């Protein structure tokens, strides 16, 4: 399963997003991805930085998007449709959030 975790990192020198938010978003993304993969047993494919996510361009707090798989991939689609695996996915995400906030 392909896992991607994205956060907004502006490509321009005159960014409207602070370095603190970018750094915190990177930490959030990396932490969530690590715990998500260790909980689900899925491969960690790394963090993808992307500045094309218009829905999160103006965030003032750490932000990340977790792609948990691709419905276009029959194996991933079947796994994500399984209620038992959905619970594992939720636990992995919760573990990452808890770790980020130091719980």
Regions found by a protein language model. Name each.
Residues 4-103:
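Active-site-proximal helix/loop segments of hydrolytic enzymes
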């Amino acid at each position: 399963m392909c896992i991607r975790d994205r956060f907004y990192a502006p490509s321009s020198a005159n960014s409207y997003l602070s370095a603190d938010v970018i750094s915190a978003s990177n930490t959030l993304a990396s932490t969530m991805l690590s715990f998500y993969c260790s909980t689900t047993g899925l491969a960690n494919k790394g963090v993808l930085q992307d500045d094309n996510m218009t829905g999160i361009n103006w965030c003032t707090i750490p932000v990340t998007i977790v792609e948990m798989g691709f419905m276009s991939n029959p194996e991933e689609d079947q796994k994500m449709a399984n209620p038992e695996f959905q619970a594992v996915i939720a636990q992995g995400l919760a573990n990452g959030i808890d770790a980020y906030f130091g719980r």
